[in-house]
Amino acid sequence: MSGLRTLGEFIVEKQADFPHASGDLSSLLASIRLAAKIVNREINAAGLGDITGAVGTENVQGEDQQKLDVYANDKFKAALEARDQVCGVASEEEDEAVAFNKELNQNAKYVVLMDPLDGSSNIDVNVSVGTIFSIYRRVSPIGTPPTEEDFLQPGHKQVAAGYVIYGSSTMLVYTTGNGVNGFTYDPSIGSFCLSHENMMIPEDGKIYSINEGNYIRFPQGVKKYIKYCQENVPEDGRPYTSRYIGSLVADFHRNLLKGGIYLYPSTQSHPQGKLRLLYECNPMAFLIEQAGGLASDGVNRIMDLKPTELHQRVPFFVGSKNMVNKVEEFLELNREED
């Protein structure tokens, strides 16, 4: 037990590397840690209480809100507001950004964007789900309510990002721009403990993750990349293995550990893609680049995109560097056919 480093201890250690740090970001991360524990407890008991299934309402994207979506959203909002380090949040479950109105919150330096429960439709069948978060330093004046500009910042302005995966074990993975570290929740002591230090994704992988049920609607470049993945070329390590869970956090986490690529391209029904730039793609892009991988919309680096609206969608290709480069090649060569 003496060799364990908890998330709290790790954050304090890293803060010591920056003598002029105020500790606000450390406190903010502690709020996320607390909310993750509460949500984890509820997910673990989801089959025993009236917490699964749909609420009967839709979010701004037109998706059915699950009971756990609403629960997780409320818990993360409450935890972030209570610590006074956050002036406002944007969430998949909220039509507009939420400003915290207490004076202490308006004096806060940070805004948080989040998907409180990614993959929540999988809860009823006991498949891994997750929370995704992204932290920015506000651009509006301290002491005033947050503005839309605080949230519509490109991904390269992020100061921290991460996710929590609620699976066979619960893990919190995050970066502040100095590498990626993972912490596994130990329920016996109620703490996240460092289990995966300085996580790096292999430059090549053997896994591709995409919903092939939409194959007929994919751009030609993506169709040809899938065929490339399936070709029998043993000297090149192909065919690759197809693995798709349907939960971004779960698919991303596996590929981060093992090497691979996650693809959610544009389709005929979703020409702008389906994943949200601000609270799904940007945080995952920050993590993957810190781990040695790449994230792209098929043409541009994800973190260079300038957001124009809160719930903006983009095509998303993320994972091992060489695999993302390869799918970009296929998209470029076949763009005129689409």
Curated annotation (Swiss-Prot):
One of its GO terms (molecular function) is fructose 1,6-bisphosphate 1-phosphatase activity. One of its GO terms (biological process) is fructose 1,6-bisphosphate metabolic process. Its cofactor is Mg(2+). Mg(2+) 1 binds at E92, D115, L117. Binds 2 magnesium ions per subunit. Substrate binds at D118, G119, S120, S121, N211, Y244, Y262, L263, Y264, K274. It is an enzyme of class 3 (hydrolase). Pathway: Carbohydrate biosynthesis; gluconeogenesis. Transmembrane segments: none annotated. It is found in: Cytoplasm. Mg(2+) 2 binds at D115, D118, E280. Its EC number is 3.1.3.11. PANTHER family: FRUCTOSE-1,6-BISPHOSPHATASE-RELATED, SEDOHEPTULOSE-1,7-BISPHOSPHATASE, CHLOROPLASTIC. This is Fructose-1,6-bisphosphatase class 1.
